[in-house]
Amino acid sequence: KKYLAFLLPIAAMFLSDISLGHKPLISIYIAFLFIIPIGIKLRKKITYFSIFNSSIIAAILFFLITNFFVWINSSPSDGLYYCPPSLMGIIKCYIQAIPFFFNTLLGNLFYCFSLFGLYEIISKRKFIYINS
């Protein structure tokens, strides 16, 4: 049921945004729609290499998509962070976002390796049940 791979994360994010009082940001939902197929493909063959590559690709996609929307929605009232609607504006937008990219990448690598590693440990472990 691949549709659940899309529905559950998007619904969970939407509900958490609403319950926390955050305005849902369409750019984040769109980024997730591009990232979820990477996770679906990753499930077919989980290796250190595939986890590493998937984490990097997901971080790059998230960076490109969300910051493109930041640039599109930028206005002069943003002051120092204003990115004009030009080639230099989008370049400025992406340059300003680089520190956030590294945090996203490190988070992806940490959580992907932790979660997939934990899954591998649990799935290969044999549990012995003792009746008392």
Range-by-range predicted roles:
Residues 3-41:
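Interfacial aromatic-anchored transmembrane helix boundaries in multi-pass membrane proteins
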Residues 46-129:
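Membrane-embedded alpha-helical hairpins and interfacial helices in multi-pass inner-membrane proteins
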